[in-house]
A protein has these predicted regions:
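Catalytic cores of enzymes that engage adenine nucleotides and/or redox cofactors via long glycine-rich
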Residues: 73-211
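Beta-rich, aromatic/charged-enriched effector core domains that present basic-aromatic interfaces
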Residues: 1-119
């Protein structure tokens, strides 16, 4: 980005930078934290600033529950014999079938393996259903098993919402509101809500600012 700006200045080209709706922060929101005179940037400091600015899980200027993070509660092993929540994937359609056959016919020797079934939602309706399914079946235990790994299980209690946010099927501001509404209405455990929101308003926005 800096090289683009510098080159445009050199060529006397006027630059207009637009805010990206795929992120919560505007460009000017990031400039105060990611200053050029700072040598190090810490995600924890950024995250606290985000919580205060967005008034997310705050009681005045104090974090709800008395702690900024509950990461120490989010490292449990998945219990032996516990059955993970059922995942309902989108139904395969004609377009996906055509794409699947095309890739197999023309790139059969390439690395990787393409799934015969659709994994991710591909429109706004399916994205909304996917979010609601996460809230109802996986959100409550998202926190404790956030770092858990089980052989032959790829999702467990994760949301798998990142691809949908990254391509604009779910707006991050709407996502934060949906998470908070469900948290308060259904008495979801605090470490699950905080741990999830830290990924959205903390890590995701922080890494964007770093880049």
């Amino acid at each position: 980005f800096k090289r683009i700006i510098d080159t445009c200045k050199l060529k006397n080209i006027q630059v207009e930078v637009y805010d990206n709706p795929l992120f919560i922060n505007k460009n000017q929101d990031l400039s105060s934290f990611f200053r050029s005179d700072k040598k190090k940037f810490f995600q924890t400091s950024f995250y606290k600033q985000q919580r205060l600015k967005l008034d997310v899980m705050m009681i005045g200027d104090k974090p709800e529950g008395g702690k900024w993070t509950y990461d120490d509660l989010n490292r449990e092993k998945y219990p032996k014999g516990k059955i993970p929540p059922t995942i309902t994937y989108p139904e395969k359609n004609k377009i996906y079938t055509e794409a699947f056959n095309y890739v197999n016919d023309n790139f059969n020797n390439n690395y990787g393996k393409i799934n015969e079934e659709i994994i991710y939602p591909y429109n706004f309706k399916l994205a909304k259903e996917w979010l609601n399914a996460f809230l109802k079946t996986r959100f409550e235990e998202f926190g404790p098993y956030e770092d858990a790994v089980v052989k032959e299980r790829s999702i467990l209690n994760h949301s798998v919402l990142s691809p949908l946010i990254n391509i604009g099927l779910i707006n991050p501001k709407h996502l934060v509101k949906s998470i908070l509404d469900y948290y308060y209405q259904h008495n979801i455990r605090i470490n699950s809500c905080e741990g999830f929101l830290r990924q959205i308003i903390g890590w995701r926005e922080f890494i964007r600012g770093v880049y």
